[in-house]
C-alpha cells in the first residue's frame, strides 16, 4: 500500500480529505471551496495547463469529473508534497489506476495541481493497478 506523510496540522489533512471526497463524489461545489482563486492545473504529459479557479473548474467539469462513485482517491506523497492516486471505474466495473495528483497547498487552499496521466506511476507508490 502507498504511504502518506501526515500533514503537520489537522487543517491541512482535512483539506486533503475534502479534495479526495470532492473527486469521489463528483462534487464541483465542494472542490470550488478548496481551490485558491489563482490555482494552477497541469496535466503532464499533455501540453495543457489552466490558471485561475474558473478555468480549472470549467476544464474539470467538462473532461475530468464523472459520476459519483466512479473515482476513488488514495492519499500518498511525492517529493515531500501531498499527493493523491486516482482510480477510475471501467466499463467492467473495475477501478483502474488513472493518474497521480501532486498538490501544492497554499495559505487559503490548493494552490497548484499537477496531475500526471500515467498509470504506470502507481507501482512507484506501492499501489496496485486495480482496486
Describe each PLM feature range:
Residues 57-131:
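Low-complexity, glycine/alanine/valine/leucine- and proline-rich hydrophobic stretches
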Residues 1-66, 70-72:
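Solvent-exposed, charged amphipathic helical/linker segments at domain boundaries
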